[in-house]
Amino acid sequence: MKNTILILFTAFIALLGFFGMSAEALADPIADPVAGPNPEADPEAINLKAIAAFAKKLLG
């Protein structure tokens, strides 16, 4: 029973990783896989420039 749960959990994590990578590849199909994520293609990426501009505006 313990082995079955471990195998199912591992398969679930593998599927999550596979579909997550597929979604990122579909968002930016011409991206270089070695270069890392493209912030323009990844809607969940942190936009540091916007945060810096907001902080600058807020602080004066």
Curated annotation (Swiss-Prot):
Propeptide residue intervals: 28-45
AXPX repeats: from-to residues: 27-30, 31-34, 35-38, 41-44
Cellular component per GO, a single term: extracellular region
Residue positions where Leucine amide is found in the record: 59
Record flagged with keyword Chaperone: no
GO biological process, one term: defense response to bacterium
Protein name listed in UniProt: Mastoparan-D
